[in-house]
């Protein structure tokens, strides 16, 4: 790819194969809150994906949870809950990993720390087996995600 990047493209550098596989897995499901995936180069570890025109939640509203509108928090919870229900645990819930576009749609990015829960995994889908069996603090991450997405509906 040349130095000039088309305006529809975002190039993320230093992407692990594990993170790429998670992006690819979710991209193939055509989820409306995941940017489109175009290409991954295993040699350079660059991931080419859809550029979302907008700002991160943290940049737009600030880093304090209380400053983020309840509607945005609810959308983030819905995304995290949906991912959990399909077996993906996304513990890196920070305002910098969610983008609000010009239409106020919330997008999720950065799957470096997420992992697949093997007990929910389709037995024919072994893409994550060797990557997600030894996640440090796995149970704590799962509990955090469950508490955030299922137990905090009023705030």
Identify the role of each PLM range:
Residues 33-73:
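Conserved structural core of kinase catalytic domains
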Residues 85, 101-155:
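C-lobe/activation-segment region of protein kinase-like
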Residues 53, 95, 113:
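Short, glycine/acidic-enriched loop or turn micro-motifs at the edges of active sites
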Residues 85-95, 100:
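Catalytic-loop of the protein kinase fold
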Residues 1-25:
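ATP-binding glycine-rich loop module of kinase domains
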